[in-house]
Amino acid sequence: MANFSLKAVKREDLGSGASRRLRRAGKIPAVIYGGDKEAVSIVLDHDKVLHSTEDKAFFSSEITLEIDGQEERVIIKALQRHPYKVKLVHADFMRV
């Protein structure tokens, strides 16, 4: 089983306008939910996530997200793609 790890930053600005600005800057808005903790909005680097999705194991493996120095073990639950561009739009992760 492959090990996947991605770096993320907590999101302060929420909403569609903020998400649009992130996408233009080469980032992906995402959310982590599940477990006994509150949902957390995060930002990921688009190119690193896109590169990880080229490996089919990414969708069924445990992923380690490093968020501001803390590690979260998650699995990917949803990944939204642009209808015709090779772009990711949003990701949902669930805590393991």
Swiss-Prot record:
Any one GO MF annotation of this record: structural constituent of ribosome
Transmembrane segments: none
Keywords, alphabetical: Ribonucleoprotein, Ribosomal protein, RNA-binding, rRNA-binding
Alphabetized CDD domains for the sequence: Ribosomal_L25_TL5_CTC (cd00495)
Biological role stated in the UniProt entry: This is one of the proteins that binds to the 5S RNA in the ribosome where it forms part of the central protuberance.
Listed PANTHER family: RIBOSOMAL PROTEIN L25/GLN-TRNA SYNTHETASE, ANTI-CODON-BINDING DOMAIN-CONTAINING PROTEIN (PTHR33284), RIBOSOMAL PROTEIN L25_GLN-TRNA SYNTHETASE, ANTI-CODON-BINDING DOMAIN-CONTAINING PROTEIN (PTHR33284:SF1)
Protein name according to UniProt: Large ribosomal subunit protein bL25
Species of the source: Francisella philomiragia subsp. philomiragia (strain ATCC 25017 / CCUG 19701 / FSC 153 / O#319-036)
